[in-house]
Amino acid sequence: MEAVQLDKNQEPNYKGYSGSLIHPAFQQQTTKREKPSTPLPSLDLLLKYPPNEQRITPDEIMETSQRIEQQLRNFNVKASVKDVLVGPVVTRYELELQPGVKASKVTSIDTDLARALMFRSIRVAEVIPGKPYIGIETPNLHRQMVPLRDVLDSNEFRDSKATLPIALGKDISGKPVIVDLAKMPHLLVAGSTGSGKSVGVNTMILSLLYRVQPEDVKFIMIDPKVVELSVYNDIPHLLTPVVTDMKKAANALRWCVDEMERRYQLLSALRVRNIEGFNEKIDEYEAMGMPVPNPIWRLGDTMDAMPPALKKLSYIVVIVDEFADLMMVAGKQIEELIARLAQKARAIGIHLILATQRPSVDVITGLIKANIPSRIAFTVASKIDSRTILDQGGAEALLGRGDMLYSGQGSSDLIRVHGAYMSDDEVINIADDWRARGKPDYIDGILESADDEESSEKGISSGGELDPLFDEVMDFVINTGTTSVSSIQRKFSVGFNRAARIMDQMEEQGIVSPMQNGKREILSHRPEY
């Protein structure tokens, strides 16, 4: 097709899409799907990638082993290669050091050793769990891709007993690495631009979407970049639309803290210690036909005349794609909210995944690090950044494109993992599949600020002004005959307090009657004023 050259003085012709006011480039591309019959997405939504047949040969392994031993001797380090593990991205040569030789001596010459061996970079593993050796990890000439489908289709993922299983990728030996977010219980992720951090976060999300139902796990996603997580909008797991406004993101974290305190009150009332015990007790009494009334309900909290029955609590996973932007807007406030959640939220099922491309001490503060013991480092710019996230070096020598170091809770050992890969189309396919299964049940008020609500109340009480939504709500009530506060909340996406205030204003205007036996009547039509 030949490109059409426009005269600089000629106005563009927009008649080609005259049937719509919106250019096709700006229209949301929605794929209509029938509701799937399976309880969870099919692996067929993920692509099969052909394996790379170019692998390292035994002769190459032997040659590199001899070169490593020779170059170490040149640096007055006596060692011999005892074992070799060939992975998808790197090969680890396990060496036995002569008695009296410190592993730190090899680490101190890693840059010189990489230059002598003519590798882009190498990483020295001073400790290999269960072995008396050190490891020298060298990049493979022909890198293997790790498709997400291969990891999710593995026995390790299928048979995992994890509550919140996350597939990270494959380790040095090519074995899938599956971790449990519920046991972490929070995760800090850092990596420079192009390191594969965003793909890694998507891998974690898709792992959960392949294992959990919306009634069991809910997401709050915070996306300062606007484009990274917006693909998940309207999936049924969301508690609120993907948050892109950083001020509203602070409100979402504040809501999480309030929800944490509310859940602890419920656990205390039922005399259980964690979310698992709470849900078991709810199931137990429901099986006996004795639903448990909400012990912290107060008259006026809802329009009900009696306390509603308790339901099982769902896990909540809070994902922040660029934590540094959030800290720039409200650093001290955000730090305190994150610290409170990290300290206490584990037992009641709220878990954090915080990702940043700037692992500096003003972003990952000491207070945050102390309360988030599980970390993942993709490629970073310097040893200082590596120490900031992992408390040790190594991440600066990674190879990018999903190459990562994982440090689990309570362990100083680092696991090198090659992250799973999926395309943007695969992410869209899975999100569309979940959207076809149902709509999200958003909770009003998550993004609202308590200060805004208080100022709104003061403005109405002092000046007597009607709520800006008053006319619309009044028309809705008169036309539908519905006088419940909950219906106003759902229709206009407002919190309970605001909806109740509008209902009170309609009562003052004589449009609806006072509450009688939990109901109101419509008394008149639109007033003249």
Swiss-Prot record:
Residues 1-20, 509-529 are annotated as: Disordered. Residues 174-387 form the FtsK domain. One of its GO terms (molecular function) is DNA translocase activity. Residues 518-529 have a biased composition (Basic and acidic residues). SUPFAM superfamilies: P-loop containing nucleoside triphosphate hydrolases (SSF52540), Winged helix' DNA-binding domain (SSF46785). GO terms for biological process: cell division; chromosome segregation. It comes from the Bacteria. Keywords: ATP-binding, Cell cycle, Cell division, Chromosome partition, DNA-binding, Nucleotide-binding. ATP binds at G194, S195, G196, K197, S198, V199. Although strongly related to FtsK, it lacks the typical transmembrane domains located at the N-terminal part of FtsK. Belongs to the FtsK/SpoIIIE/SftA family. Homohexamer. Forms a ring that surrounds DNA. May function as a DNA motor that moves dsDNA in an ATP-dependent manner towards the dif recombination site, which is located within the replication terminus region. Translocation stops specifically at Xer-dif sites, where FtsK interacts with the Xer recombinase, allowing activation of chromosome unlinking by recombination. FtsK orienting polar sequences (KOPS) guide the direction of DNA translocation. FtsK can remove proteins from DNA as it translocates, but translocation stops specifically at XerCD-dif site, thereby preventing removal of XerC and XerD from dif. This is DNA translocase FtsK. The gene is ftsK.
